[in-house]
Amino acid sequence: MKFQELLAGKQINWDRVKLIRHNLTKEEIAANYERGYLELYQSVQNHARFRDCDMVISFLGTEGTNGVFQGCYCVGGSKPYIRTKFPEDFVPDSGMTEEKSVVYELVKTDLLADMKDRLVIDWGKGTINFCQNGTTEKEVLEIRPAVSEISFTSYDRVLLSFETLHKIVYNKAAYKEWEEKLSAVAGVYLITDTKTGKH
């Protein structure tokens, strides 16, 4: 099945859609993703990137040529990129300059909202090209099961019981989101015996 087929009947003009893939192997992307700035990061582009499109569909590259669906965004206007108006710990890439970049208004829609972090596509061999036309067909690799009982909230809130940790480790397919997010950053995790307090 092609990704575009999932949005059949939604009256989308694919000629005016851009597909983007953020590769977590890039340090600045991993850093912004960890800090919750992925949407902010993708809003900063060169003047022409999203000028002639109505929608941007975002994916996260976590391994190989895959793309994990993040959301569909309507494209609004743009304003100048001014670094000092961004969070201090935001990490711009080398192409983001105040002379060449703008900040696009990207409004997240509810299209496929229930598929965030679950729908996985094959981006194809052209992974170096992070932005492609919406008419470029993408094969759906998998739709992961929805798991709500153990949801990942943020990196500074990873506090799991041994039973929960065991469930995640031995059910990787169901808890793929945990594997992706924890492997995206370097970290040391402390295991503590709740009875003795020993680490």
Regions found by a protein language model. Name each.
Residues 1-197:
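GIY-YIG nuclease catalytic motif and its immediate N-terminal context
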